[in-house]
Amino acid sequence: GLGVAVDASSRGYRVLLVEQHDFAKATSSRSTKLVHGGVRYLQQGDVSMVVEALHERGRLWRNAPHLVKDMRFIIGNYRWWERPFYTIGLCCYDLLAGRLGLGRSLPLSKKQTLKELPGLLHDHLRGGVVYHDGQFDDSRMAITLMQSAHDHGAICINYMKVTSLIKNDSGKICGAALEDTLEGGTYEVNVKGVVNATGVYVDDIMQMDKPESRKKVRPSQGVHIVVDAAFLGGNSALMIPKTRDGRVLFGVPWHGKAVLGTTDTPLNENSLEPKPLDEEIDFILDQAGQYLTRKPKRSDVLSVFAGLRPLAAPTHSDSKKTKEISRNHKIYVSDSGMLTITGGKWTTYRQMAEEAVNKVAALIGLEPRACVTRKMQLHGYREEVDRSVWDYVYGSDADQIAALIENDASLGELLHIGYTFRVAHVIWAVREEMAQTVEDVLARRVRALFMDARAAMEMAPRVAAIMAREMGKDKNWETEQVKNFTNLAKNYILA
């Protein structure tokens, strides 16, 4: 949805984006933090999807270098045939990326492998293979897209829910009824076209348009756990090419932590806060433990989170296997003229948006205008950033945050002794990033909830007080915000 807003507004179209909760509240903030082509899909022979994703990976790296970086991934080899097998396959992966590649895949000796990833299991290790993919911060990218859309004239509003669609006498959608979910106001807007890009909720909007609409999405739950970066021991990521359920498993350095995941559990229900299953958590700990010298335990988990992939439903709706559910995106157009886009992944968001805007513009008769996002610098663009401090995620906006602290030294105070989040980051989130709640700040503006849920709970009262002063809220609001966030954060902590 944010990608569509950026694409359409940068072409000069008038755009309104409404989000029922906060930007990236659900799936978009709960990824494996990768911008990648998908090695697993290459193994499955889905070459066209891999090529598209690799090219989009390169474009995203070029358009937002402050948020996307080259990450070295290590595959440890424990059998004689694995090093030549994976080296050949990953060299093909590199070739498919063409000029948008990030680096060459190479075989490694045992010594080189352990230098890259000291935490890798030493016993029976023969060597390894290194390949390159992208790593990013998902919700910070979402906020960057919101700001980029705004820079091009789009109106983006969070906590604004579509409650019904308005149609003209011909049955075509010409407007929508909206509800402010924080303040309770209701509104109506007139529109020429509607793009339904609501992730796992696309079916709800389609049924709002046409109650008998067949479901287009099959949710699949992916769980991740976050542990200390010492489990990996280096700056490179771990890739386990085949777990017992046939997936790959990643261990990715991220903001001084390590993200381990993911799972692939088909579900029939949607939730803004899906709950990780015990068996999913145990699966990740077990599989990671088979490849790491230090075996992660439940007591080592700093945060656990689950997200729902909006996979395009298979032709046979009774299929239970997520392997049969397409990772490609699909576009549907209803009789009323609403365009729905579903499937896909973070890496290909820009391509999905380009296709959606091309189609909706033709559908409603807008003047054809070329897409400009393939080589468009996103908000905050900065080529060189210091990734040792939190401020790098803001790109060029970090200078303005530094100016706040220069004008008032108290804004440089840390929110928590163990992290570099500062009072100024909360002020900035409220003034410039549309943060409305403590959760918005601690989950998606700074990533404390996903990095260390207990520490985030300790930050909540301070954040609530800062926001209350900035937003003119009373003590009751502060108390309610801390209570709500504490109840939420408990779901990110293992008992």
Segments the model singles out, each with a brief description of its role:
Residues L182-G193:
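Core beta-strand elements of the Rossmann-like FAD/NAD(P) dinucleotide-binding domain
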Residues L2, I143:
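Residues forming the Rossmann-fold NAD(P)(H) cofactor-binding site
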Residues S9-R30:
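Glycine-rich FAD pyrophosphate-binding loop
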Residues V162-L165, F250-G251, I331:
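A structural signal for short hydrophobic beta-strand segments in well-ordered beta-sheet cores
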Residues K33-E116, L249, D386-R387:
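Dinucleotide-binding Rossmann-like beta1-alpha1 core, especially the glycine-rich loop
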Residues A5, S9-S10, S148:
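Gly/Ala-rich phosphate-binding loop of Rossmann-like dinucleotide-binding domains
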Residues H21, L67, Y78-G89, L102-D123, ...:
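C-terminal accessory subdomains/tails of enzymes that are appended
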Residues N158-C174:
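A conserved short coil-to-beta-strand element within the FAD-binding core of flavoproteins
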